[in-house]
Amino acid sequence: VLQPGYPLLDDLQLWHIPADGDLRMLRSGDHLPLADRPVMVRNPWLPVQLEPGINQFLLRVDTTSTVSLPLHLVSWSTSASQQERLMLFNGSFYGVVFGLFFYNLFLFLSLRESSYFWYLVYNINMLLFIASFDGTLWLFGGPGGMLQSSIIYMLMFSHCIVATQFSRHFLHTATEFPQLERLLRAKMAIMAVFLVSLPVIGLHAYNTLASLAVLVSSIILLASGIHVWRSGFRYGSFYTLAWGLLLVSLIISTLNSLGLLVNVSAGTLWIKLGVSCELVLLSLGLADRIRALREERQQADEKALQAQLERDAQNRFLARMSHEIRTPLNGVMGMLQLLRDTPLNERQRHYLDTVNGPA
């Protein structure tokens, strides 16, 4: 079986010219429904049967996406062995993503924290993008044709928007970094315009623009995380490390697609590994930030309780002092009242009036 390792190729036509000259043609690609492909898998595989003698093959590729064409000609037994390992990796990836989604969904329902909501939206968007990028999404049916190709690029633009919105809440830019907040808001507005620009600029330009948008967006968000981290906020370290790992995986995948690395077939695997690490680190960062907020709230409550205890102690002290002062003073005033009722000469009465005067 001839295995093209890139599932986003629109249309592949393979002509097989065996030694007897009997021309045969096979067709596959993501524009064909799964039931119409020669092999019903997410990649556009083409089964071939080698006849004795010289076999010639002509392959024509027509696609609107990046032309990445890693080819492997393997036996069915070797292919089955490779698919076992690949299914294990893909199952682990989707298991991690779904596990993080439901874990953070539980936290969102418990805490009602907006950052968790936007993490869930980001998780879903990233899941749909990866599933469409590696062809898994279309195993369950797809529109086919140009619409299916454009959906992938729409998900790339929505990724830029949702990632920025999540970053605003995660990094607290509205309250801590007003200038960065304005930059991220402007970035979201620009990405929203790009998202709806397909009818104006066409699919080819839309494809190029989506790739550039993801690259520029990732760099801006990484720089934002570094700025927050350097400003002394601990959660910025989780954010920076998460986006750094994602960028490294994207760079490795790009180098693979350009043929600059030896293992040219592992590009999608690197992206999945980077996305998994990013989502895990962002989830840890959210948990750390919530824990830090709870510690700050607990410290504030302890300070408020301490201040209340000090006020209560001061009030008790004043009440005790007032009681201790008023008790002998009341005795003195009573004696003065008794003296007023006794016969006094003029001088004694003057002294008594002098004492009673301030009272």
Where are the regions that the model predicts?
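Soluble non-transmembrane domains of integral membrane proteins
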Residues: 1-88
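Carboxylate/His-rich catalytic cores and anion/metal-binding grooves
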Residues: 11, 117, 128-129
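First transmembrane helix
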Residues: 84-108, 211-227
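Juxtamembrane interface at the cytosolic side of transmembrane helices
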Residues: 101-123
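Interfacial "cap-and-anchor" motif at the non-cytosolic start of specific transmembrane alpha-helices
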Residues: 128-169, 173-303
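Residue-level marker of regulatory loop/turn positions in helix-turn-helix DNA-binding domains and
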Residues: 233, 310, 344
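Primarily the dimerization/phosphotransfer
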Residues: 299-341, 350-359
